Curated annotation (Swiss-Prot):
Name of the molecule in the record: Ribosomal protein uS12 methylthiotransferase RimO
InterPro entries membership: Elp3/MiaA/NifB-like_rSAM (IPR006638), Methylthiotransferase (IPR005839), Methylthiotransferase_CS (IPR020612), Methylthiotransferase_N (IPR013848), Methylthiotransferase_N_sf (IPR038135), NA-bd_OB-fold (IPR012340), Ribosomal_uS12_MeSTrfase_RimO (IPR005840), rSAM (IPR007197)
Binding site for [4Fe-4S] cluster 2: 161, 165, 168
Cofactor note: Binds 2 [4Fe-4S] clusters. One cluster is coordinated with 3 cysteines and an exchangeable S-adenosyl-L-methionine.
Enzyme class: transferase
Domain MTTase N-terminal: 15-130
GO biological process: tRNA modification
GO CC terms, sorted: cytosol
Subcellular location: Cytoplasm
Protein family according to the UniProt entry: Belongs to the methylthiotransferase family. RimO subfamily.
Record-linked Gene3D superfamilies: Methylthiotransferase, N-terminal domain, Nucleic acid-binding proteins, tm_1862 like domain
Source organism superkingdom: Bacteria
Function description: Catalyzes the methylthiolation of an aspartic acid residue of ribosomal protein uS12.
Amino acid sequence: MSQTSISSAPTALTPKVGFVSLGCPKALVDSEQIITQLRAEGYEISGTYDGADLVVVNTCGFIDEAVQESLDAIGEALNENGKVIVTGCLGAKQSASGSNLIEEVHPKVLAVTGPHAVGEVMQAVHSHLPKPHDPFVDLVPAAGVKLTPRHYAYLKISEGCNHRCTFCIIPSMRGDLVSRPVAEVMLEAENLFKSGVKELLVISQDTSAYGVDVKYRTGFWNGKPIKTRMTDLVGALGELAAQYGAWVRLHYVYPYPSVDEVIPMMAEGSFKGHVLPYLDVPFQHAHPEVLKRMKRPANAEKVLERVRAWREICPDLTIRSTFIAGFPGETQEQFETLLDFIREAELDRVGCFAYSPVEGATANELDGALPDEVREARRARFMEVAEQVSAKRMARKVGKTLKVLVDEINPDGGIGRTAADAPEIDGVVYIAPATKASKRYKVGDFVSVKITGADGHDLWGEV
């Protein structure tokens, strides 16, 4: 059972809810919001199936493997507990017959909702497990209940997406872009920093599009006007982070021209060191014909020019991206163009998926589907080239002294991350010496580490 137990003062009459959270960081934020509301209403969060009066499962439905994992988790919860409420992206998915997929596979579930549905989930919980008469709302921290370690947190700034990429079904499950009010985002960020968070990871389906749906409406924070726009929000978050000596990291940044305005914030002025020189930009491919079939921006030469311009302004910039190999119709020549792009762009961190048909995606209707073995071979070749590029860039860090955020302390020393490393998806820094590590620093501290070794993914160094 994959969930975080939240301590409280249980009584025999306290209703208890188990929680299973699957999927991406955006789904994790949904889980945090549901758990925060449960706690605010006086429910206890159980760490076991046996100790729970019912179980909520937050699902993922993006790719086939995630669908199966979610269905298996629902089945396990039904077997172990019997009372299950399902929410998340898979909850919005239909089966081939047109009925709700979850209800068709698991007809015994108590209720099913789609993603970002705190109100609907709470209604279902109330129906099957009435809330306590005297909830202690003031026991819930202002920052809400978080499922991440105390020193970092995800800050979701919008829901949904306006793009219609042919390989993606997210808009059909999460809808079009809906930006959160800028004052609401800033208040959450402030509460998180006050609670001890040292790193905020800004997430959404499309961070660059923040505010498009409200025409960049001006909001107010602490009496100051702030436009509902990515660059203005990043500036405000950077200013706030500087007050707490914290980091702000940007994820899911679609390569709009406005991104160019953010780079100087990473390189100079009062934001430097707080708005991290890190961009997570999902390029997906480099050949114009493949990008056209994906319905993605289709000019790799301009992308290369922008990457070079970004690095000229901010030499320490780390660029992470994701790609798809073996997309329908991709020729060997087009795949080689992708490899050339990786070599020329020298991206620091990349992930690659062998294309997999996703039920409901329009890419399934495209001609030229490739055999499984070809798709997987291209993915493996892509990662081989990407590893070579990454190892070359990582080697340049040897001998430098870098600021590291400590994530863990164990008998071998410390484990942390630099500004170039997002949690769980990027590399780590192994910190020596092991002796008296816990007396030198603690989890959530920033330490200066001299880098002594590197491979294509991780670094080694000494305090």
